[in-house]
Amino acid sequence: MAERRKIKTEKGLALVPGANKLSDGYNFVLEVPEGSNASLVLYKKRARKPFVEIPFTEENRTGNMYALAIPDFKSEDYEYNFMVDGKVYTDPCAYRILGRERFGAAADSDPHKVRCGFLKNEVFDWENDRNPQVPYYEMVLYKLHVRGYTKANRSIRGVKGTFQALEEMIPYWKELGINTIELMPAYEFMESGIASDPTTAGMVSEKRTEGRVNFWGYIPGYYFAPKRSYCATDDPEKEFKTLIKKLHQAGIACIMEMYFPKESNPVVTLRALQFWKLYYHVDGFHVLGEGVPTELLMHDAILSDTKLMFHDFNEDQVIRKKNPAGKCIAQYNPGFLQDMRCFLKSDEDMVGAAAYR
């Protein structure tokens, strides 16, 4: 209780989910199902056990949102999680996820191992960064997986499979004539489940799912945090910003794939895209999944000059501009890519399909 009294709290503002800086402190906001109990768990930086747990009260509730403010909060000294009905809950709107530095590592049995970090209050020198503004009719797009693309590349001098390693590929892309790259999910996602039972290791079972790794990332994710295991440094924000800056200096745009399942909150989806555009200077998004609020994204003023690629949308919703370079909405049709892959592999009955494309 002595530790509890060290943390002064106030009622927060239930507008923006996650942990966000105020003029004189930090605001913590969490959506909680009706009837559930929740609390904020704070850890001293790199400490194994929680420093303090602060319950949300009815005073902190607005609808299904809990909001709690901590004045004079020094975020550089802390990490955090939430607790919902007695279980540790990692903030889905966290800007940094800690404890997932090694790709494919099984989830730790300690629920406090994975936790959330805060945005750094450091100024990044963008050096007058500008969006390349590559129109669709001039786009030569190169799609890649951040880890898989450079992991086996012997020419990479730095840490392979990282954002930093992609910087070394820029001269190669320029030589190919590439002016846009598309990153498969590069935000944080939990690629591994719980650790598999060592007593059954090596046994074949069609029903076995433990220990498998989701390499691609087309699952629900932490949409505001660059994937930590794709980083060569311990500063994901700076590393990703540096990649974008160097791409732009070379005249190459960056499109991010974002996957949203059916149950996704459309407001969080919109805010995630706005955040990557404003904070990381991303040029556009290939938005996938059954939970895509297409109309909401297309009519957002912040995203009005941002490339948005959907697999399907109502064309009547699109505001067509006279300047072709200003057309930002596109239908992403992978048919050509799939047919040509099969044709180049000499799959059967692909000559007609390739000719049609």
PLM features: what roles do these ranges have?
Residues 155-162, 193-249, 253, 260-282:
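Aromatic- and acidic-residue-enriched carbohydrate-binding clefts of CAZyme catalytic domains
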Residues 107-113, 281, 294, 298-357:
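Conserved alpha/beta catalytic core and glycan-binding cleft of carbohydrate-active enzymes
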Residues 140-142, 181-183, 254-256, 285, ...:
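Hydrophobic faces of well-ordered beta-strands that scaffold small-molecule active sites
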Residues 31-37:
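Short proline/glycine-enriched turn/loop motifs at strand-loop junctions of beta-rich domains
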Residues 80, 84-129, 191-226, 250, ...:
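Core domains of carbohydrate- and sulfate-ester-processing enzymes
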Residues 30, 144, 183, 223, ...:
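Conserved, mostly hydrophobic/aromatic
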Residues 168-186:
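Catalytic domains of carbohydrate-active enzymes, especially glycoside hydrolases
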Residues 1-25, 50-53, 60-145, 150-157, ...:
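The feature marks proteins involved in alpha-glucan
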